[in-house]
Amino acid sequence: MRGTRLALLALVLAACGELAPALRCYVCPEPTGVSDCVTIATCTTNETMCKTTLYSREIVYPFQGDSTVTKSCASKCKPSDVDGIGQTLPVSCCNTELCNVDGAPALNSLHCGALTLLPLLSLRL
């Protein structure tokens, strides 16, 4: 019985690896209008985050114009403090496929993590 559970765990982990190809993010290395940043790039294996930096925030309020952003794949990303009112260049980070279509506000959970927990719970390790 325990061997069956371990085999199931190995199968789930293998499936997660197969289902998780390289991350893809929207990229625009130069400040670009949000609606104009439509180039998609496949990230390298060590780039596990999509990063968005917001520029020209002051011209957006009161909704007179489009904000500009830079977007990229990133190996590290430190998001701005949510309460950081008045920050000059707010940064947002996310880690799912094409998640930086806008300014993604936070990290999303990994679906494979939940799949991995199910067999572990039944193993009672």
Swiss-Prot record:
It is a lipid-anchor; GPI-anchor. PROSITE patterns: LY6_UPAR (PS00983). Residues 25-100 form the UPAR/Ly6 domain. It comes from the Eukaryota. SMART domains: LU. Glycans are attached at residue 46. InterPro entries: CD59_antigen_CS, Ly-6/neurotoxin-like_GPI-ap, LY6_UPA_recep-like, Snake_toxin-like_sf, Toxin/TOLIP. Keywords: Cell membrane, Glycoprotein, GPI-anchor, Lipoprotein, Membrane, Signal. Pfam families: Toxin_TOLIP (PF00087). Its main location: membrane. Residues 104-125 form a propeptide. This is Ly6/PLAUR domain-containing protein 2. It comes from Homo sapiens (Human).
